[in-house]
Each structure stands twice: as structure tokens, then as C-alpha cells.
Amino acid sequence: MKLSFDLKKKNGNARRGQLTFERGTVQTPAFMPVGTYGTVKGMTPEEVKGTGAEILLGNTFHLWLRPGQEVMKMHGDLHDFMNWHGPILTDSGGFQVFSLGKMRKITEKGVHFRSPVNGDKIFMDAEKSMEIQKDLGSDIVMIFDECTPYPATHNEAKKSMEMSLRWAQRSRDHFDKLENPNNLFGIVQGGVYEDLRDVSIKGLTEIGFDGYAVGGLAVGEPKEDMHRILEHTCPQLPEDKPRYLMGVGKPEDLVEGVRRGIDMFDCVMPTRNARNGHLFVTGGVIKIRNAKHKTDTTPLDPHCDCYTCQHYSKSYLHHLERCNEILGARLNTIHNLRYYQRLMESIRKAIDEDRFDEFVTEFYERRGREVPPLAKEQ
């Protein structure tokens, strides 16, 4: 089913909306937990839903390698396979291929690489990506693109962006040929170069997509460049389509993305950091392994309503971390995912109440920091 996007309110550049799918609604700005292999690591779908998540991200590349398309089709689709019946967005596999480094060779046709699972020679292109994502039953399908590395010269970024545009057209054509009833998002590329981003946006909007992602950021570039590119890019994207910042990020990055007009985010940070004992709280980050928490009988965050904070102390979580107990990673993950969803809930409430600027100020004050200036203010 084609999504509908209802842009309900704006407060400055911050946008408050609702995405409606056949499988449910998603309030925006939204954060999508990452379920790389058909699971948010260590969590049941019910637990993930209990944190407030309304949409998940699945990984086309990894699910293609394991368990494969045939197993997926035996179950129906990814929703049935993992027992998550809300909306799912799947990335196209482009970033994972980019991450393989020397193990892959990129050509106009697509990407040749060796499987990180068993070393087999594999080829992926725009058409294959569209076919896999249709079999996954993805509510939002991402085009196949090349993630421009950082650093890249203007000429390197230009060639990469132009090839991604050609792949975008191929993705659109094959998506339509497959008669996929769901939604296809374009991905803006162009590195840190504003003129290349302009060309990418123009090409993508001429092709026409159900939503637009900003890709090729959070790949090593300075934060100032990411903010500058977002400020330049977002105003040029269609007002009535959702905007998705891929692979971002820290709580501060989510706030800064919303300040610049982003509606959707995903990142492994809350789950990966949880497994490493780095826990997000109102004032910043707690490293639960540190010795000072051994005798601290207070909850992680007195403002948090998650299962972990309602039932366990820092002392207990410290003990689990020191003993490498699986329960520790699970409780940490529940907390971090709930922190991210509470952050998004607070952002949405602030936009609804026309007090987003005040929210941003308070957010940074609790961290003992100044609000970063917008690029146009510098």
C-alpha cells in the first residue's frame, strides 16, 4: 500500500507528521531501531514495541546472504519471519557493499564482491536489490546507490553521485516492473559538495519517489559539514514527502536533524552501545562498567519509565556487566531503545506546542553545552 504522509505542523524547520501504512501508523519525527538479521539484537518484537517503536529497519544485504530469499518466501515475508507486524523499511544493501572495502569491485552494472559469510563470489545490482526487497515485503524500499566515501574529491563525488542517479532510475524502473505495491525512496548523494547535492536532488525529484533520504553522511565527515549539507539539502526536498537521514545517530544528531527538517532516523547506536555498557540518560551517557556504580542503588535515569529503570539499580546493572551476563545486555538495550523513543516523543510534543527551540536549549543545558549554531548563523 502507498503510504500517506500528513505534515501536521511546523515549528521553524522542525516538522511534525504522521506516516500511514496498511500495517499501521508512524508518528514523525521517528527513530527506527535496526534489526539487521531480522531481529533487534536480544529483543523480542513485543519488547521492541514496548519501547515505543512503530517502525523497524531491516538489512537487505545480510538477509539476502542469510537466510536467503527462498527461506523468506517460505514464511511469506520478513514481517511473518520475525513476527513484527508493523511497518518495515529495508536499506538497499548499498552501504553494506560500500563497507566491504577492498572485498568489492564497483562497475556501472553493479557490484561484484565476495560474501563475508563464506567467500563466494556474488553480484548485486539495482534490479536484484529491488527483487530482494519485494520478497522481504518491505513497506519502504530504498533504491540501490553507492555511498560516496569520505574524503572524496569533487570529481570522485561527482562520478559516484551520477552513477547513483543512473542506478536510481534503474531501481525505479524495476520496482515498477515488479508491480511492487509498496513505497520506494530515493537517496540524495553528493558528498560534502552542495552543488552535487543540488544535481542529485533535481535528478531524483524528476524520477519521482514516495520519500527522500539523505545519504552519504555520518561516514567520517566533520559534524559541521553534515549540518551544512542538511541545511542546504532539506529545503529543496518536496515538502509533502517524508525525509530520512540514514544511519544517524547520537541523540544530539537526532535533535540537529529535526532542527533542519528531517522526519526519520535509524542507527545501531542505542543497541550497540547498550551491549557495550554505554547507556543514554537525560544528562548524557553512563558507563555502567565504571566502579563508582557498584554500590549505587538508584535507577539509571529517574525520568525514565522503561522496564529496566522501573525494576533495577545501577548497582545490579554494573554487576551484570562485570559478569558478562546476557541479561545485562538485554536490560541495557531495553533502556537505550526507550531513551531514544522518549527523546522522539519529547521532540514531537515540543513541536506540537510551538516550543521546539526551548526544547533544544533545555536538551543542551542538561548536558552542560551550548546549542550549536545553524550553519547560516555562523
Curated annotation (Swiss-Prot):
Report the SUPFAM superfamilies cross-referenced here: tRNA-guanine transglycosylase
What is the annotated signal peptide range for this record? none
Q: In which pathway does it act?
A: tRNA modification; tRNA-queuosine biosynthesis
Q: How is the cofactor bound?
A: Binds 1 zinc ion per subunit.
Question: Where do the segments described as RNA binding lie?
Answer: 247-253, 271-275
CC annotations in GO: cytosol
For the keyword Glycosyltransferase, the answer is yes
Reaction(s) catalysed (UniProt annotation):
7-aminomethyl-7-carbaguanine + guanosine(34) in tRNA = 7-aminomethyl-7-carbaguanosine(34) in tRNA + guanine
Using the record for this protein, list the coiled-coil segments as residue ranges, or answer none.
none
Task: State the family named in the UniProt similarity comment for this chain.
Answer: Belongs to the queuine tRNA-ribosyltransferase family.
Name of the protein described by the UniProt record: Queuine tRNA-ribosyltransferase
- UniProt organism field: Vibrio campbellii (strain ATCC BAA-1116)
Q: Which gene encodes it?
A: tgt
